[in-house]
């Protein structure tokens, strides 16, 4: 997520272009990091077996790639992604239990859907304005 792969750009004149970039949904990828940290703390403090299971599988699927010294691409992380999503579910469940209502579930799912819709033009090659594409460059390392 720090430097996505830029696959394609097509210029259609004026301020209109299309682009395809390999980038994940920030609500899943970045929240997955927070959820992973939550699992680490949770496993040390409470030793819940279901969270330990998720943590072990995240480490088993991620560590072999983390130790490689060459450039890594998003697809190297794909085997870990289902377990990161389970970690997010565990974190969202914990937050919802603390809040004693389902509003956080609704908020998080709405955020995931919203960010999918917002980033859809740059992951699909949909023709749109250059200004819109530029507005999606949240980090300076995002070149597309």
Predicted regions mapped to residue ranges:
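Hydrophobic/aromatic-rich transmembrane helices and adjacent perimembrane loops
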Residues: 72-92
